[in-house]
Amino acid sequence: MAESMGKRYEDVQDVLKHHMMNRRGALRAGLGFGAAVLFGGSALSACSSGDGGGGTYAGNTKKPAPDEGGGGAPIGKANIPTPRDKTVIIGQVDFQVFNSFNPMIPNGSQGGNGFDTMVREYMFYLNLPTGELIPWLATGYEYNADFTTLTFKFDPNAKWNDGEPLTSEDFKFSVLLRRDNPALLGGGGNAKDFIANIQTPDPQTAILELSKPNPRLHYDYICSIVASFDILPKHIWEKEDPTKFKDNPPVRTGPYMLDKAIPNQKMYVYKKNPNYWNKAKLDPAPEFVIFQSTATSQDAASQAFKRAEFDVGSLDEQHAKQLRSEGYEKLITTPFNDPCPRALWPNHDPARGIISDPRMHHVISYLTDRDKIGKSVWPVETPPAQYPWANYDGNQKWEIPAVADKYKLEFSPQKAEALLDEMGATKNAQGKRMWKGKPATIEVITPAPVDGAEYIIGQTVVTELKKVGIDANVRSYTGSVHSEKWERGEFDISSQWCCQMSQDPGQLYNYFQTRYAKKVGENAVGRNQVRLKDPELDTLSKQLDNLDPESAEAKPLLEKALDEYYQNLPVIPVIQTNYPAYYNTTFWEGWPTEDDLYNVPNNWWGQFMFVIGRLKPTGQK
């Protein structure tokens, strides 16, 4: 059986190796995490240290006067219902949902509100910067020789915040709930494809009996990017309809509990769980953690940060540079490179008109000036993306230059026009492109605000489309509205991010399988929102699902699958990106820095729980 793993560095082959990289080399690469707009922070960019005499990437040692922030800035009074010196305040996106914490239904839970990081916990955490796999709710896992059973052991000390023990029965209930309800967000998927039965011989043991071998099923239970499998308390959820239950207040196992949500302040207040089960390993100093929407004006948000009314976020790189130049000494900027390039997602459903033709996807690619976007849209230069995954050192093994060179993602309006003519989308007397007797039109949607990078990327493409005779526009929607349109296929192109590959390309190809394609207007429940139907890619993907991706048997299949992907371009890579984290050291110290990147620094990732656990009060009142 799977025993406690203790301190372990991720030699689990395909998780860490495909996430990790030489850290400093990666910082130079200019990557970024795509869910920043949806899960936290405005559309930020990689940042430079600048020449200002203030905050740096490693922090400063000079201390301001007791009632001043860095650079002599006065400390403001944060509008919060808790003692400031006992509270960490995190600036976040515009919150909309305050009365529901059910992530399995549309608009059932607000992304980036702290629930995923402070209240929920996961079976395992992958610390990307260090490479350590951290067992948490589970203590270990083990496969049998032919990968047809997967055994998890759970920590006998784990308890829900209502005092009930977490057991293997909770895990079994949670897995089967999703397996047997594919309409739920996160439903179906690998659980439906692979898990035939679950045995629970004792409260700490769950044995997954698989319908076919799968050496990578444990990936689903590791918090590697943002979040992971959410174990639900059976004693609560078995009495509820999962399609309607709001789960408010949420019962989970984390070190914090929901104290209150304050809609008119767009604020969530979390308080320490006095009976937290894992205090021996994690006993955070802050009594409260608040996630709050920042001001819509970046100038106002920056001033709030300068007055130490926020400890995390509430800043973009433009204003961070300004604070440095002013000598603001309490700013720490920590760059972090994550797995999601910026990308354009074209809809494949014929109901959406010209965009459904795969040739139009190549037109869009030819009209995407990646060099310009990488140099001017992101505040620091970031490289173009050729593959639909991050250019980590560990991902180089998945690159196939012989295939990529056939489909070079280049900026060429001339090739775009020639391809449009070849498609029959010729210009009328007014210079407008026609498609099947009607004017060709394309709308780009994005969850980014109008000054966000994803919006600007969409705008650059719209500008080029107009030049070649296609009426086009770009629209910004709030996260919840965009999410609904995205899942229902009610878009032509979505400008956002591509986070579908965290371990190997087989994950991306599985995501696009035809069985997940729904009619426009139906919820895609988290997969194949672009409605791709590609039988050849389906066949290759299903073969790859059962293979070690680094095996000799998988190599030719990966090559064919990449070629098939490029032919259809169901997601169009744009640039690699970087999201720096901004911290204020007025009230709290111990933040991750470039020189001490002890864990993932992004506040919307599950691993941020460990950052909160490292903080110490400065003594500022």
What is the role of each PLM region?
Residues 155, 244-247, 275-323, 362, ...:
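Ligand-site clamp/hinge motif
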Residues 72, 384-429, 448-456, 553:
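Structural transition elements
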Residues 188-237, 366:
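Surface-exposed binding/hinge segments that line
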Residues 1-25, 35-42:
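N-terminal secretory signal peptides
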Residues 583-621:
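Long beta-strand-rich cores associated with HINT superfamily self-processing modules
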